[in-house]
Amino acid sequence: YTVSATDNAGCVTSTSVTITQPPVLTVNLTATQPKCFGATNGFGVAAAFGGVPSYTYAWVPALAGNSATSNQVGAGNYGLTVTDGNGCTVTSSMSLVNPPAMAASITSTNATCFSACNGIAIATVTNNIGPVSYVWTGGASPVLSQTLTGACANTYTVLATDQNSCTA
């Protein structure tokens, strides 16, 4: 902008001013999904650019926190408002989704005779991530195997755990 002034004697003076604006405020939001069905270990990481530092962060719902990295949360929809040093705002959102629930099934063969300890049970899991460890309980001591052999008549329980610590 330029302004000019002329006095009574006809002398002219002028001056200019340039008004600038900061770069546009933007935010990049990266979501990390929960590792197990129903887990509360998902989170978001925001990176603000432009505007005028410093930045403040407000997640919705509030349980997600007020920093660039959200608190650990479960599946759901989350909003984020970033405010720069001039009070300008930008919003973004993310959706966290549960992975499919890990599930276990058991096939078994009963003991062949009364008091025989030759029963077999085999655990199978679906929706696991990576290798699975198995722990059978109900016998004299825990069995760390996918297959339970030499089982006497009893009720047995298996706990299957994958590499994300998801269980079934």
Where are these regions (language model features)?
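Proline- and Ser/Thr-rich low-complexity, intrinsically disordered segments
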Residues: Y1-A168
